[in-house]
Amino acid sequence: MPWIQLKINTSGKVAEQLGDTMIESGAVSVTFQDTHDTPVFEPLPGETRLWGDTDAIALYDAETDMNAVIAMLEQEPLLGVGFKHKIEQLEDKDWEREWMDNFHPMQFGKRLWICPSWREIPDPSAVNVMLDPGLAFGTGTHPTTSLCLQWLDGLDLEGKTIIDFGCGSGILAIAALKLGAARAIGIDIDPQAIQASRDNAQRNGVSERLELYLPKDQPADLSADVVVANILAGPLRELAPLISDLPKAGGHLGLSGVLSTQADGVAEAYADKFTLDPVAEREEWCRITGQRHTS
């Protein structure tokens, strides 16, 4: 069905209050969007952090009397009479089909492809991971996931054990298994991520070689030849003592989820136990890799 979209520019300080008023006026949903595409990263737990200059965007049923909606919103002290706004009629589309049409197989490195299940596999002789977007992060489209997949493709994983710390969809652990790893261990704080990883591993025929744990359940003596953690800079710094002990002597470490401006701070937290490689960058994100000291 078609929808009517109402966009109002406001400030981050009052955006949520305005959103509540838009819901009261009959909106079926309200979203907030940065007017200038400025990213916001790592809000504190329980915090909804918004931009200084924010667009509040509400959707209304196509039959809604928008004159009545505007009249109601003009009573809101935050807006007042004659406030600036933009109303658009949204085209009725098969949004699911349009979304699926825009998701294509992607190649990472020389051997590895990530393919949605509804697309034909471009190279049957390659290492193909079948993965559809779902509840947890990680389909290969984000620069940090891409950086980690390319790194894994360049390693000799034959017979190795890998730990995917913050496994999300399981994409990194599953890719490692299909690239030759003998065993993978996925750890995540989100039970939905654990389930998504389990489902994706089964779809790719590697579930028997993938172990999945919530942090409270993980064995105390975990170690691996390769450890990858694609989370965020804050947790990578805070958890450095734990993550640093996971790779075996001579083992490989890959860290991402880090902005290029945060790379030095994260690298410093691992420099005492690892010989670090030059930082790899993509867009505004980076990947930090290294090898654990043998003594």
UniProtKB/Swiss-Prot annotation:
PANTHER family: ELECTRON TRANSFER FLAVOPROTEIN BETA SUBUNIT LYSINE METHYLTRANSFERASE (PTHR43648:SF1)
Transmembrane helix recorded as keyword: no
Family assignment from sequence similarity: Belongs to the methyltransferase superfamily. PrmA family.
Gene Ontology terms, MF aspect: protein-lysine N-methyltransferase activity
Subcellular locations according to the entry: Cytoplasm
Enzyme Commission number(s) of this protein: 2.1.1.-
Residues reported in the UniProt entry to bind S-adenosyl-L-methionine: 145, 166, 188, 230
Gene3D superfamilies: Vaccinia Virus protein VP39
Free-text function comment from the UniProt entry: Methylates ribosomal protein L11.
UniProt entry keywords in alphabetical sequence: Cytoplasm, Methyltransferase, S-adenosyl-L-methionine, Transferase
Xref: InterPro entries: Ribosomal_L11_MeTrfase_PrmA, Ribosomal_PrmA_MeTrfase, SAM-dependent_MTases_sf
BP term (GO), one: methylation
Name listed for the protein in its UniProt record: Ribosomal protein L11 methyltransferase
GO cellular component: cytosol
Lineage, highest ranks first: Bacteria, Pseudomonadati, Pseudomonadota, Gammaproteobacteria, Enterobacterales
The reaction(s) this protein catalyses: L-lysyl-[protein] + 3 S-adenosyl-L-methionine = N(6),N(6),N(6)-trimethyl-L-lysyl-[protein] + 3 S-adenosyl-L-homocysteine + 3 H(+)
Enzyme class: transferase
